[in-house]
Design a protein with these regions (language model features):
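Glycine-rich, mobile lid/loop segments that gate access to catalytic sites or pores
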Residues: 69-167, 181, 185-188
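Short, glycine/charge-rich beta-strand/loop segments that flank catalytic centers
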Residues: 6, 55, 80-83
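Alpha-helical support elements that line or immediately flank enzyme active sites
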Residues: 56-77, 112-126, 222-240, 361-368
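Terminal-appendage/accessory-domain detector
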Residues: 1-53, 150-163, 170-392
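Function-dense linear segments that define catalytic or interfacial modules
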Residues: 34-48, 52-73, 88
Length: 392
């Protein structure tokens, strides 16, 4: 999907304003924002805040990067924009609540548009009044549905949220005014979008930061599958598991994931990212789930993987938290082994570093991954300059 969008936007032409991942030439701000956001979410590495159930980084960082290029902002202003944007998206996501999500909205994009708007507004140096107008403008474009999970449209929704947020900030800068009381008013955003109106989302503004609770992804698939992945990796590593030793696998998950990442028979690589059974089969058969090529169309028809899938049973359990799961493996020799894992548990920094570096190395290689980790590129230069120098 990112290749299609990239080719479409390149064909549109326009000013060479902003950095695009994978392109030598720059593109107009809106094009760059769209491509980078779609690419970031399609890769499925973007992190999650489980309080809001949203992925904020692809939307906000893409918007902030493009606007920074337009304004020639240094890395300090860029970083501030990213932080306030992500914090905004998280807090609005929490305010919307589970009701909004279970109604069918893709909260990453519905709440995320406000993150991209605020990030862009900060980098543009908008006043409080104009920032409020930008948020009001953005509310008219907030969209995204969970029905698109497993399709190319899911990352597109993220791209739309990033782009519309940037547009909203520029419109407000030029003087477009909106109703700024859009969240709580009768027939406003909250009631229209099935919000829970959770005021706890706005407690301790400027004192407590929800961004500190963002959890990183270590695998290139839906974050709802990651506690299962970590549980199974533990069992594979500690019991030398392989398919020939396994009689069956039972996986206990929070019921909400039956509708999110439990595609029984994925038809393409994107759907594999939302399939407990196929991801388990990949791990048992020694595939690396940090690699993008693991989630290929061809693997949907891999006979070894399909054989392993038939051994897996997914069981919904109300006692299992949203961030945890339990994997039980019944071996052919009669033994039963199990592991429970909660991805909300805080990791040691050394463990976090190891996992992030392994993921990055799978995508970018060892040399660039080391530069990303050790380079001090948050100096006074334009953020995209470092990216162009090291990633293109």
């Amino acid at each position: 999907v990112s290749k299609i969008i990239k080719n479409l936007e390149k064909g549109n032409g326009g000013k060479k304003e902003a950095f695009v991942i994978g392109l030598i030439d720059r593109l107009p701000i809106k094009s760059a924002t769209l491509i980078n956001a779609v690419t970031g979410h399609a890769l499925d590495y973007d992190d999650t805040h489980f309080g809001s159930l949203g992925h904020t980084s692809s939307i906000v960082i893409s918007a902030a990067l493009a606007v920074s290029d337009k304004k020639k902002s240094n890395a300090k202003v860029f970083k501030e924009g990213v932080l306030v944007g992500i914090e905004t998206a998280i807090r609005i996501g929490i305010w919307l609540g589970r009701k909004h999500y279970h109604q069918g909205f893709h909260i990453t994009s519905t709440a995320g548009i406000f993150g991209s708007t605020v990030a862009a507004a900060h980098i543009l140096g908008l006043s409080k009044k104009k920032t409020m107008n930008a948020i009001g403008i953005a509310s008219a474009s907030s969209s995204g549905i969970k029905a698109q999970f497993g399709s190319m449209v899911k990352p597109l929704q993220v791209g739309f949220a990033a782009t519309r947020g940037v547009e909203s900030a520029f419109m407000a800068e030029k003087g477009i005014k909106a109703d700024t009381n859009i969240f709580d008013k009768l027939d406003g955003y909250g009631t229209t979008y099935s919000a829970e109106f959770k005021d706890c989302a706005f407690v301790n503004l400027g004192k407590k930061y929800f961004i500190n609770d963002v959890k990183f992804k270590f695998h290139a698939c839906c974050h709802g599958t990651h506690s299962v992945i970590e549980s199974l990796i533990y069992l594979i590593d500690n019991y030398q598991l392989k398919d020939s030793l396994i009689n069956r696998i039972e996986v206990f998950i929070n019921p909400q994931y039956l509708k999110i990442c439990n595609i029984e028979k994925p038809k393409n690589g994107i759907e594999i990212k939302f399939s407990f059974k196929m991801i388990i089969a990949l791990l048992v058969n020694k595939f690396n789930t940090t690699r993008l090529d693991t989630f290929s169309d061809a693997n949907c028809h891999n006979k070894k993987l399909l054989k392993t899938c038939n051994k897996v049973k997914i069981i919904a359990d109300d006692k299992i938290l949203e961030t945890e799961s339990e994997v039980m493996v019944i071996l052919k020799d009669g033994r039963t082994i199990r592991k429970k894992y909660d991805i909300s548990d805080k990791l040691k920094f050394s463990t976090l570093e190891k996992k992030l570096f392994f993921k990055s190395k799978s995508l970018l290689g060892k040399r660039i991954s080391k530069k990303l980790w050790y380079d001090n590129f948050f100096d006074n230069s334009l953020p995209s300059n470092w990216l162009e120098k090291n990633l293109q």
